């Protein structure tokens, strides 16, 4: 029997309890899987919610890591050996493939969905195994660390795909964190006129100076065709609903830990479209890669810090500080 392979990974044992542990993987990669050596892992707002004890869909301990780029170092039976050495981005959703929504092609809404880094072990680690169909090759010449932005950018490409044609539309984005700004960038790429709203002055400055957006501290009196709510709290969602014109669209992108009280009367009377959006599908991931590889999205504008895996706690602290810090990468 081959010896197990030791590696280090981040574990959150309970709220506010993060540590680095040594674990092992079987020497043989499972059939249909590839073994990934992560080269960069993003610390996401959802990771902060897990550490803070505010994520509604996890049980501790949690092994985080879903914004991941890495190199394939080994493959299991049934996988072409030519995958070894490829740079890949991780699509962390694990679907059953058999439920009603999976059979309809909406695997990201699987009735038994597990997401690596939340309900399944993630890849904030020196090694990780993943099903081959969850790995997306990066084009030659694309800087490897830019692949860590594929996952958050795919959230935006999916949301804008669901929003529909926004060419020439007036779009307001509520929230200037990573997801808000990815949505703003994709909306602008799709031809929209974009206003970014955030109550935090430092984040408004980032949106204006790094990305060239018009910014505001509140929605104000202007009416918009589409509102992209990327905050995940009641006040932001109510502002989004109030901001759109009759027959306008409100995209609920932020994750709400509590059910918000909204203006249902407005939604009905004004024939508003209130659309939720969860994660992404393969076509959204592919578009995210194309935008990054083609230089349509400047990945460097998001990355503020790079830290070794051993300094994961510091990375979380930097990300939690918010303000002008958008994306912290852990580099094993």
Predicted feature descriptions by range:
Residues 1-5, 238, 282-332:
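C-terminal hydrophobic helical "lid"/dimerization subdomain
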Residues 9-28, 45-74, 89, 109-121:
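N-terminal glycine-rich cofactor-binding segment
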Residues 26-41, 55-100, 139-141:
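Glycine-rich beta-strand-centered segment in the early N-terminal region that forms part
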Residues 85, 223-224, 299, 312:
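Local beta-strand N-terminus motif with an aromatic residue
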Residues 94-174, 300:
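NAD(P)H dinucleotide-binding glycine-rich loop of Rossmann-like/cofactor-binding domains
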Residues 142-217:
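Mid-domain Rossmann-like dinucleotide-binding core that forms the NAD(H)/NADP(H) cofactor-binding site
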Residues 219-227:
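A short acidic, Gly/Pro-enriched loop at the edge of an enzyme's catalytic core
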Residues 234-296, 331-332:
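Glycine-rich phosphate-binding loop and adjacent beta-alpha segment
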């Amino acid at each position: 029997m081959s010896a197990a392979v030791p590696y280090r990974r981040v574990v959150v044992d309970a709220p506010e309890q993060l540590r680095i542990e040594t674990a092992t993987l079987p020497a043989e990669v499972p059939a249909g899987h590839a073994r990934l050596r992560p080269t960069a892992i993003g610390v996401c707002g959802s990771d902060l919610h897990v550490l803070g004890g505010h994520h509604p869909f996890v049980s501790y301990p949690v092994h985080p890591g879903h914004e991941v780029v890495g190199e394939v170092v080994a493959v299991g039976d049934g996988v072409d050996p030519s995958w070894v050495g490829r740079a890949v981005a991780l699509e962390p959703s694990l679907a059953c493939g058999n439920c009603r929504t999976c059979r309809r092609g909406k695997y990201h809404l699987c009735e038994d969905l597990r997401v690596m880094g939340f309900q399944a072990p993630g890849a904030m680690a020196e090694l990780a195994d993943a099903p081959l169909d969850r790995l997306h090759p990066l084009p030659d010449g694309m800087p490897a660390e830019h692949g860590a932005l594929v996952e958050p950018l795919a959230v935006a490409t999916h949301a804008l795909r669901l929003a529909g044609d926004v060419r020439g539309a007036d779009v307001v984005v509520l929230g200037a964190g990573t997801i808000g700004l990815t949505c703003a960038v994709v909306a602008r790429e799709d031809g929209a006129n974009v206003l970014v709203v955030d109550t935090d002055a430092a984040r408004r400055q980032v949106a204006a100076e790094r990305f060239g957006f018009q910014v505001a501290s509140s929605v104000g009196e202007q009416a918009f065709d589409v509102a992209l709510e990327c905050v995940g709290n009641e006040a932001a969602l109510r502002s989004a609903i109030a901001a759109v014109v009759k027959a306008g669209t409100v995209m609920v992108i932020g994750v709400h830990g509590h059910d918000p009280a909204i203006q249902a009367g407005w939604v009905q009377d004004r024939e508003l479209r209130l659309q939720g959006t969860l994660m992404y599908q393969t076509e959204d991931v592919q578009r995210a890669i194309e935008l990054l590889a083609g230089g349509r999205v400047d990945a460097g504008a998001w990355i503020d810090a790079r830290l070794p895996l051993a300094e994961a706690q510091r990375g979380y602290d930097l990300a939690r500080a918010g303000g002008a810090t958008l994306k912290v990468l852990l580099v094993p």
